[in-house]
Amino acid sequence: MSNMPVLIITLLLFSMYISTAAQKPTEIKCRYPADCHIMCRKVTGRAEGKCMNGKCTCYY
């Protein structure tokens, strides 16, 4: 039997974990992604974020 399906599932789960660990949801209200850049720089040190459901989500 091949170990390829197990490897693919493991990589998929690991990549999903990494992507959620790199996000920091905030309570900062926004209307546009540009509203989040200054606040995300204060929270994470990087101006990378987007406006989702009216609140900023910052990325590391």
From Swiss-Prot:
Tissue and organ distribution: Expressed by the venom gland.
What are the annotated disulfide bridges? 30-51, 36-56, 40-58
> SUPFAM superfamilies of this UniProt entry?
Scorpion toxin-like
Give the superkingdom in one word.
Eukaryota
Keyword Iron among UniProt keywords: no
Q: Which GO terms describe its cellular component?
A: extracellular region
Do the record's keywords include Disulfide bond?
Answer: yes
Q: Family membership, please give it.
A: Belongs to the short scorpion toxin superfamily. Potassium channel inhibitor family. Alpha-KTx 12 subfamily.
Q: Protein name, please?
A: Potassium channel toxin alpha-KTx 12.7
UniProt organism field: Lychas mucronatus
Q: Organism classification, top ranks?
A: Eukaryota, Metazoa, Ecdysozoa, Arthropoda, Chelicerata
